[in-house]
Amino acid sequence: KVAFLGDSITDKGVLKDDTHYWAYLDQWLDITPLVYGISGHKWEHIPGQAQKLRNDHGDDFDAIMIFVGTNDYNAALPIGEWFTEEVVTVNADGVMVQRVRRTPVMDHSTFRGSINVVLDGLKRMFPDKQIVMMTPIHRGAASFGEDNVQPTEDHQNGCGEYLDAYIDSIKEASALWSVPVIDLYSLSGIYPMHEEQAIYVPGGTDWLHPNEK
C-alpha cells in the first residue's frame, strides 16, 4: 500500500482513475494506491492530507509519495532559508564552549520552511514508513479562467523566482532530511514549452498538466 500526497496531478478527479500515474504504478507494480492529492494544494496542505491518511488507514501502509510544489511556484511563495543560526553554549569534550547552532525554519511562510514542517512532521508521525519526494515537472502555459492565467516557466513568478529554484530546494531537502527524491523535472522527458510536446499534455488552454500518455 502506497500513499500519494500532492496536487492536481495526483487528484483522483482530474483524469480517469486508470490513467493517473499512480494507476500505472498499480498496474506495473501491483501496489494499492491510497490517493489524497487535491487540486491546487501546496506544501502547506500536505500535513492535512497526511492526517487524513492516518485517520483512514492508521499505520497500515508501506510508503508515502509526495508530488507537490508547482503551485507554490505559481503562488510566488518566497524560497526562504532552511535554518536560523544562534550562538549557544555546549559541552564539547568536557569543556563548555560556544558554538553556532542551526535550527530548521518551521513555518509555512516560505517554501523551505514549509518543506521543513512537512518532512519533520511525517518523520515523527510515520517513523517507519518510506517517504519519497517527486519534483514538479516542467510547466507550459495554462488558462483556467480570467483570474487564473499561468505563464510558462521561462517567466519569473511574483517574487522574482524561476521554477528551477523550487526544484533545487526539493532536491536540497532530500539530503537535509534523508528523504529520496525522484527528479521528474529532469527525468520525465516532458517539456511542454514546445508545441511538439503536445502529445504529453491536454493542450488548448492547458499545457501544465500531463495527459494519460
Where are the model-predicted features located?
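Oxyanion-hole/transition-state-stabilizing segment in secreted/luminal serine hydrolases
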Residues: 15-18, 45-112, 139
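Helix C-cap/helix->beta junction micro-motif
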Residues: 29, 125-127, 177
